[in-house]
Amino acid sequence: MADDRFTLPLRPLIEKRDRPDPLPLEIAQINAQWGSFRDVSEESLRAKIEEEKSKEYTIEEEEGEGAGAELDTTERLDQLYKRRAEIIQFAMQAHMEAMFALDFVSMLLSKHTPRQAETSMSAYLKQVAPLGSLHSEIINPPPKSEAVVRDTKTVSRGWRLQSFNAAADKLLKSASRLENEVASETRYWHEVLAVKDKGWKLCRLPRQGQTLGVQYGFLEATPIFRDRGLAALRRSEDGTLILDKGLVPTKAKTVRVRVKDCGIITGCSKPYRSAAQDPDSIEGRILQARDTLYEEELFHELFREARIMGSQGVTTRQNLVQFPVSEEQEILLDLVDPDQEVYVDDEATKSEEHNVLADALAHLIRILLCYAHRQNLRRRTQPPPALSPKRRHIPEYQLLRPIMAYLQHSFHVRWLETFMKDVYGVLQSAGLSCSFTATPYSSVNLSNIDRSVPKVEGLIRQFLLPLESTFSADLLTPQSSFKVKSRTNLSVPPFGTQFEILLNLPHYPDVHPPHRIGLHDQAANIITHFIMLDIVAAIELQTSPALSISKTEAKSVSWEATYPHHGELLSVSIDGKQKKMKVILSRDELTIQTYDVLGLERYSRAAPETTPGLQTHTWKAGPTTAPSLMEYVAAVSQR
């Protein structure tokens, strides 16, 4: 029995484990070393503790004695070399025994597979012994008793039953897991097909080839928002489809348009809601992500355009774009959460008269952004320009400029129409037959829309052109008229609204209006001045001797325009008396002043209130029973 033992002197160092043994393993070790817990008593434990203490004390004494007798350096080196030689000798012996065992097995196998066995034989064995010289036979084992055979069969049957039960449990668990997985996959793919049937584009994610994604963004948007328009369709544990929206915020956002008039919010656009019937469904989440991304891009482009329009009065803050329409009215645009109460209660809203205008502007900026996307698609389908080392600048979309042009043009058209109505109302109350015709937005010609593009794009192109409105008016004298063109352009300089007046005054052919007028007050003064000139010419023509046919008119004096640009006329009677008439026209009234002049007073510009014979008559808009202008002139012209 001693010869069968195998001792190996190279024992590995015992290292402390990083993790302690689990409790079941420790219990098994305790049972194997100390026996069952039933045999443990308090006396046996105390005896074991005392025995361990005595052993530790003995070991400490031995170590103390050994530490006192230190070896010198030479003895330590000799001892080290001896230990090294012993280790090498044991290693060589182990190697030789392993080679002998390998040669034995190889020689035994050479009887059946000589080629394979020859590769593992040593060179010495090949020389001294031929292949196949060693053979093995199976001998009958000693017979076993029936009890041993019966026990072996029982144990084998138990192991097989245990293995079958374990295999059955694993198969049942696998089947249950597979059934759940199939149900989850089926539900996932049903929802994916439902998304595809709704018309959404499905594709693989760029850097995740095994993950499907839905393209809900706009391919013609700027790269910042185009790359964010792709979301992953992931599967939850129960198979529900999860939309991984990435950088898109979870809360909805919308661009709000407000109208401020005289410092008070008088209009606010309605919050934009998604068209999905069920916002919690996968389609509702996709629509919300698409709408939110679109609204963020819209506000981003509004902010970009506002930065280049600072010279036109557009101001920007952290989350606000503001631009003026007139001196009293402003438009405010910001990006807000439509579900919060701050959507309406941010500032005091005391009126809702401009809600329709705010809604119209909100729809218009979204339509203009869609139009910009279509223009990007059109440019992308055309041949690219020549390569250049300079980076191509992405132009700002025209979103604010068309809105500002329309609002400013509408404001100036309404103002001009109101002004013309007031002035011509005064003239008609004075008995003067004249009229004007307004043609708003005469530049918009829907019959000339380009048929090669969709109707919506053609219609938008018409409103992106400079807006122009025309006012044609007749004057008092024959063949006298004027035309006012109001032109608004915010795309190319000169920016803003320009007034152009075309005048036809046969009595004053040298009078020409300025080419371009930028202020509506200046345009009003010029129009009023031209009408006043025509009134002076009409009075002069009415009282001229060539047209005095009746006896009554023959006894009247004639008026001659001395300073027509100041509205002054002069008459001289047969006896040498002089009278001066002054015509004063404003938006609200028409005033005629007549007074006597002596000597050099005919050259004076104003009539003093103490002038003898001062007569004044005023006409204002509205029905009146006063005599007409020509009747009054005829009355004051009597000699």
Swiss-Prot record:
Source taxon at top rank: Eukaryota
Gene Ontology annotations for the cellular component aspect, listed alphabetically: core mediator complex; mediator complex
Keyword check for DNA damage: no
InterPro entries the record matches: Mediator_Med17
Membrane-traversing stretches: none
Keyword set, alphabetical order: Activator, Coiled coil, Nucleus, Transcription, Transcription regulation
GO biological process, one term: regulation of transcription by RNA polymerase II
Protein localization: Nucleus
GO molecular function: transcription coregulator activity
Primary location recorded for the protein, binned into one broad class: nucleus
PANTHER family: MEDIATOR OF RNA POLYMERASE II TRANSCRIPTION SUBUNIT 17
Family statement drawn from the similarity comment of this UniProt entry: Belongs to the Mediator complex subunit 17 family.
Function, in words: Component of the Mediator complex, a coactivator involved in the regulated transcription of nearly all RNA polymerase II-dependent genes. Mediator functions as a bridge to convey information from gene-specific regulatory proteins to the basal RNA polymerase II transcription machinery. Mediator is recruited to promoters by direct interactions with regulatory proteins and serves as a scaffold for the assembly of a functional preinitiation complex with RNA polymerase II and the general transcription factors.
Subunit details: Component of the Mediator complex.
Annotated protein name in UniProt: Mediator of RNA polymerase II transcription subunit 17
